[in-house]
């Protein structure tokens, strides 16, 4: 069974797992961009090229994106045109947590559920949905935090080996905080998606969100001994 890859903390992983999906964060850097350089503008960022390379090399067959930046929009257009993926979907999330944004996100979730369910040939399993919610684990003892731009697994491994304290990757998708609350019971699907949209948008905000004051949680930590800011 193919894994469904994602790159954004606002990806509804729990919903995908409710339809039988196995999700994995795509966060590796390739050895080069031989494939990506043939199909994308040379000015596209390294992360965008890494996504293209992973797909064009055949590693990724299922990918769910969120429109977090112009690069992702460009990557989506290129991949849609390439026809290399068995399943490709992009969720359009507004950069705020207002009521209208929650309503729009709920609509997007239902659209994804329909498309993914048809692709998988499965229906929504509420029990699997509930089981997919897991409380985030954080380092509570003295540690160092990596903040800022997304840091790939390879570079993070190097940082871990060179620091005197345990290191927590708090960049981008790695500070996903869905799972701090369990889904309420006895809700219809539409009501459940409305609740879920609120949970997704209520996470520690991405740097691209209009109100990112909630990111203070990342450094107002009594166990934090230092910060590495990745640019």
Residue positions per predicted region:
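An N-terminal assembly and electron-transfer interface module characteristic of large anaerobic redox
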Residues: 1-231
